């Protein structure tokens, strides 16, 4: 309670006007367990994964029916998240593979809806804690795959595995740094964090290792520097503007040195080449496919299908078995091929909305949770240029992006009710109610 005015009554007592708050509901442990299982399903492949996912979706739809008065207003506030999935669902009308397109369209539409339902029932602190528990379980599930981790472990490709374990490592590090976390969860995070790093090293993905370094440094700086800086008026804004200025000056210097190939030098230091491990060839094929229907695209599931000769040519070029469902390793190209320039515009709008909310939440509340959400969002954004995970359904990067952008829309928080008079009686040296 915050006392705002004091009304004296006699020498030893007084009336005060106090702010009254309503505490949020306590979230049952069984709900937290279910949501942890949902996140685990997106972290790592499980036995009976598809039936489990459909059962969980039915539970979410049941929650939607029970709490539609809370869910629908948040859906309306988060409308940029739904425009692309809606257009994708409409694209089944011109997709050459309608059956597969209907399934994918439903999953794309359910992905942001489930995120809204989760944020309606849980606060962001509980969500991140459940994601951490899911990450712990994912590490346990991955232990039997230790020898096959260099080729992907439980995943068909190593970079998928490395990126999932990357988020486990960052969630563990965030929990370890967070003084508000339960003591035993911080101890568990201290055990899981190095194990996650070892698993990442077993799957030699240069991208994931770079993201891990950036994320760890970012969380460390927020914890021990940014939160102290935020206590000084306007200092954060000054540092932010100075940082942007330094970045722009550095970019100008690099761009003016045309005789230097910094990208090739950087990739060489990571053991990569300028084709990004063959991705440039796939990007060229994707650009050709996008030109077939530049405005509305091929429709969902219109390219990566065993019956599509162009897709199988890419498999052959990439030394993959016939029928392998690859990606273009670029989320924007993926959207452009399947949904054209209209879909690409809606995708960029979604990113603009998510980025704006993540930044505004961070500047208004520089807590470790909000800072971690900004770091996660930045990692997912950068990954869109070399991976297609941010153009998919029900995966960890999208969960972190959507839930991070929706964090402050959660109704599960302490709410201001009003003011009430409170009578206080005091003894010499102290006051008591």
Give the label of every model feature segment.
Residues 1-90, 96, 100, 114-129, ...:
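Transmembrane signal-anchor hairpin modules in multi-pass inner-membrane enzymes, especially those
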Residues 56-63, 107-111, 209-221, 352, ...:
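Hydrophobic transmembrane alpha-helices of multi-pass, membrane-embedded glycosylation machinery
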Residues 44-53, 98-103, 156-159, 189-228, ...:
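Helix-loop-helix junctions and helix-breaking kinks within/between transmembrane helices
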Residues 111-113, 122-150, 155-226, 357:
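Alpha-helical transmembrane segments of multi-pass inner-membrane proteins
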Residues 57-60, 170-174, 373-433:
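Transmembrane alpha-helices of multi-pass inner-membrane enzymes
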Residues 270-284, 288, 296-339:
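Long extracytoplasmic/lumenal interhelical loops at the membrane interface
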Residues 198, 202, 220-270, 288-292, ...:
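A membrane-periplasm/extracellular boundary helix in multi-pass inner-membrane enzymes
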Residues 120, 338-381, 416:
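Hydrophobic transmembrane alpha-helices and their immediate junctions
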């Amino acid at each position: 309670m915050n006392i705002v005015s004091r009304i004296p009554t006699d020498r030893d007592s007084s009336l005060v006007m106090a702010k009254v708050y309503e505490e949020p509901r306590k979230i049952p442990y069984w709900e937290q367990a279910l949501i942890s299982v949902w996140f685990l399903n997106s972290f790592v492949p499980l036995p009976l994964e598809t039936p489990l996912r459909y059962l969980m979706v039915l539970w979410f739809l049941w929650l939607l029916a029970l709490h539609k008065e809370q869910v629908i207003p948040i859906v309306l506030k988060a409308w940029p998240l739904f425009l692309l999935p809606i257009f994708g669902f409409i694209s089944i009308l011109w997709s050459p593979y309608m059956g597969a397109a209907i399934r994918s369209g439903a999953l794309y539409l359910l992905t942001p809806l489930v995120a809204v339902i989760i944020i309606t029932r849980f606060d962001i602190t509980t969500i991140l804690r459940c994601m951490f528990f899911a990450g712990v379980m994912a590490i346990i599930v991955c232990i039997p795959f230790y020898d096959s981790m260099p080729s992907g472990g439980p995943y068909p490709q190593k970079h998928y595995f490395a990126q999932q374990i990357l988020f486990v490592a960052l969630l563990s590090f965030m929990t370890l740094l967070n003084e508000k976390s339960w003591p035993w969860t911080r101890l568990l995070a201290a055990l899981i964090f190095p194990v996650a790093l070892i698993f990442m090293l077993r799957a030699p993905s240069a991208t994931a290792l770079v993201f891990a370094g950036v994320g760890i440094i970012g969380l460390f700086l927020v914890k021990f520097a940014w939160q102290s800086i935020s206590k000084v008026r306007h200092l954060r804004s000054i540092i932010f503007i100075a940082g942007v200025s330094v970045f722009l000056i550095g970019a100008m210097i690099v761009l003016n040195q045309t005789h230097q190939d910094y990208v090739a030098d950087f990739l060489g230091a990571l053991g990569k080449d300028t084709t990004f491990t063959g991705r440039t060839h796939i990007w060229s094929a994707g650009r050709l496919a996008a030109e077939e229907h530049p405005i509305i695209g091929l429709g969902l599931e219109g390219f990566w299908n065993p019956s599509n000769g162009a897709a199988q040519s890419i498999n052959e070029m990439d030394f993959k078995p016939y029928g392998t469902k690859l990606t273009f390793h670029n989320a924007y190209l993926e959207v452009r091929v399947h949904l054209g320039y209209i879909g690409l515009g809606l995708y960029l709008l979604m990113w603009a909305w998510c980025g704006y909310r993540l930044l505004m939440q961070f500047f208004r509340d520089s807590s470790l949770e909000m800072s971690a959400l900004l770091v996660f969002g930045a990692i997912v954004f950068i990954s869109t240029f070399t991976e297609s995970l941010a153009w998919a359904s029900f995966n960890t990067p999208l969960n972190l992006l959507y839930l991070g952008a929706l964090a402050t829309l959660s109704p599960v928080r302490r709410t201001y009710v009003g003011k009430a008079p409170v009578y206080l009686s005091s003894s010499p040296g102290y006051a008591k109610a």
